[in-house]
Design a protein with these regions (language model features):
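Ribonuclease/tRNase effector modules and their secretory precursors
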Residues: 1-97
Length: 97
């Protein structure tokens, strides 16, 4: 797998504003937290972006990224209640049956 890169300034802002970091996302991916890779819903505005769906600390985050020739560039981290419901709570209900 290609390495991940990101903007240090954006990473610092995410830590302050949302309490999450790109390092945490990469650790979660490395420990099996990658749940899905989606096409960006607005391909016209973001033609080369896709979205990583990552589980970390019992929550799901959407991480838009651009695949470069030698690395993946992570753009931001979006906490998602809807993705948490769809990816984690649905699997918890399945496990109870």
């Amino acid at each position: 797998m290609k390495p991940f890169r990101w903007s240090p300034e954006k990473n610092e802002a995410l830590q302050v504003e949302r309490g999450v970091s790109f390092e945490g996302v990469v650790v979660a991916i490395g420990s099996g937290g990658l749940l899905d890779v989606l096409a960006h819903p607005n391909e016209a505005k973001y033609p080369h972006q896709r979205i990583l769906v990552v589980a970390a600390d019992d929550y799901v985050y959407l991480v838009p990224f651009v695949e470069e020739e030698r690395f993946f560039f992570l753009k931001t981290i979006i906490p998602s209640r809807k993705a948490t419901r769809d990816y984690l709570q649905g699997s918890e209900l399945d496990a109870e049956d």
